Every structure is written in C-alpha cells, then in structure tokens.
UniProtKB/Swiss-Prot annotation:
Organism: Bartonella henselae (strain ATCC 49882 / DSM 28221 / CCUG 30454 / Houston 1)
Protein name: 3-deoxy-manno-octulosonate cytidylyltransferase
UniProt keyword list: Cytoplasm, Lipopolysaccharide biosynthesis, Nucleotidyltransferase, Transferase
GO cellular component, one term: cytosol
Gene Ontology molecular-function annotations: 3-deoxy-manno-octulosonate cytidylyltransferase activity
UniProt function note: Activates KDO (a required 8-carbon sugar) for incorporation into bacterial lipopolysaccharide in Gram-negative bacteria.
Superkingdom of the organism of origin: Bacteria
Length: 243
C-alpha cells in the first residue's frame, strides 16, 4: 500500500519551564512558524498545527499555515494529534501520521523525510529518528534519551528500549533519540487507546508504551540532532543558530 502521509505539529500554550514557548520569537518569527515552514519544505504532505490555544492558532494562520484547535487536557502530543486527525480526516485518506514536535525550530526537511523511511518495511508500526552521541556529557545526561536497539542496517535499528540512563553498557557508540514519530494510522489508533504503561511512567517516555504492548518501532539514524527548546538557555542557543 502506498504511503499517504500527513504532518501534524502539536503545540500547546502551557510549558512548565518556558511558558508560551511556541510563540517565542526567533529571527523575527514565532518558533512554531519556523517548524511549520521546515515541514512545508519537506514537500510530501499536508501540514497542520494542532494547538490548544487561539493565540497560537492566530499566529499560525497569519503566516499562511493550517491550524486546528484541540482540547487542552491532552496528556501527550500523540493524543493531541490523534484528536486533530479524527476531525481533519474522518474519511481516512491519510494512512501515515508524522508527528513533528513544535519545539524543534532547527529541524531540517531531510530529517522529516528520513523519519518516514522505516515504514517502507510493512512490519514496522512506528518510525522515529536517532543520531550518534558525540558529546561526552550527553552520555550521562538524563535529558538525553538513549536508544537501545538491534541493527537492521548501517543506518537503521529496531528499537528494544529507550532510556534516560547511560545504556547500553560497554564499548561502542550510544545513540540519541530524536522525538519525531511516523505512525501507521492503525498504530496511532492502538497507541492512544492504551493506558500508560509501567515503564513509560517510570522513565517518563511515552514510546515505551508501544514497546510494552509489542508494537514495533524502527529508528532511522541521521547525522545531525535538531535542537529542542525546553528552557530559556535553549531558546538563546537557537536564536544564535538561526540569526
């Protein structure tokens, strides 16, 4: 079956460490607009921002992008994009849903396209990205999620686990998980219907819910890591990069 993708970008107004970060100005534009523009450059599907606040919706539409307002009480971006999908596409035209985080203003079109590639294997439920860790301090940083997987090729893994700990043990490279997901529609439907799993709650990583329910996640390895914006320090770094 041919892949018919749609890109959904979740963006909520609330953020504990950096309030209203989706609207933070970077090089003359709000952060969420930078993400939408990069997604548009990937040029393979419809792009919609899914938000919980009218202020974000107004900004997104003012820049010519499509937006939908969702409920405010979603616990994850996956839940938010699923609600958006049910409103946008009741006819089920789209069979692949690409979840591009709204706080990745330095993401590239190449990385977005790469996230789809593992779905070329019909056995893969969910595809995501990773990159080799090159900074020594990141190996022990709990904010850097590591991938434990079995190699399928030189640039692809089947994920066995994700962790904030330093793993796997021993000699060899470690890989940084990049939180972009391409779901088969049926996989997203299954995922959001599941209750949070024990390991998900312990590690605070929602992708573990899928693994604990025997869903297959394959990881495409890319060369660069887009900088996520979670703090004011992150925001200042991104402003320098995109200045």
């Amino acid at each position: 079956m041919a892949l018919e993708p749609i890109i959904l970008i979740p963006a909520r107004i609330g953020s504990t460490r950096l309030p209203q970060k989706a609207l933070a100005e970077i090089a003359g534009k709000p952060m969420i607009v930078h993400v939408a523009e990069q997604a548009k450059k990937a040029a393979f599907g419809r792009i919609i921002v899914a938000t919980d606040h009218n202020n974000i919706a107004k900004v997104v539409t003012a820049y010519g992008h499509e937006c939908i307002i969702t409920c405010r009480d979603h616990k994850s971006g996956s839940d938010r994009i699923y609600e958006a999908l049910t409103h946008i596409d009741p006819e089920r035209r789209y069979n692949v849903i690409l979840n591009v985080q709204g706080d990745l203003p330095t993401i590239t079109p190449h990385e977005i396209i790469s996230a789809l590639r593992p779905l070329e294997n019909s056995l893969t439920d969910i595809a995501t990205l990773g990159a080799k860790i090159v900074e020594e301090n990141e190996k022990t940083d709990p904010n850097i999620v590591k991938i434990i997987g079995t190699p399928l090729s030189h640039n692809r893994f089947r994920a066995l686990y994700f962790t904030r700990a330093t793993a796997p043990y021993g000699d060899g490279p470690l890989y940084h998980h990049i939180g972009i997901y391409a779901y088969r529609r049926e996989a997203l439907e299954k995922f959001v219907a599941l209750k949070p799993s024990p390991l998900e709650q312990r590690e605070k990583l929602e992708q573990l819910r899928a693994l604990e329910h025997n869903m297959r996640i394959d990881v495409e390895i890319v060369d660069t890591i887009p900088l996520g914006v979670d703090t004011q320090r992150d925001l200042e770094r991104v402003r320098k990069i995109l200045a």
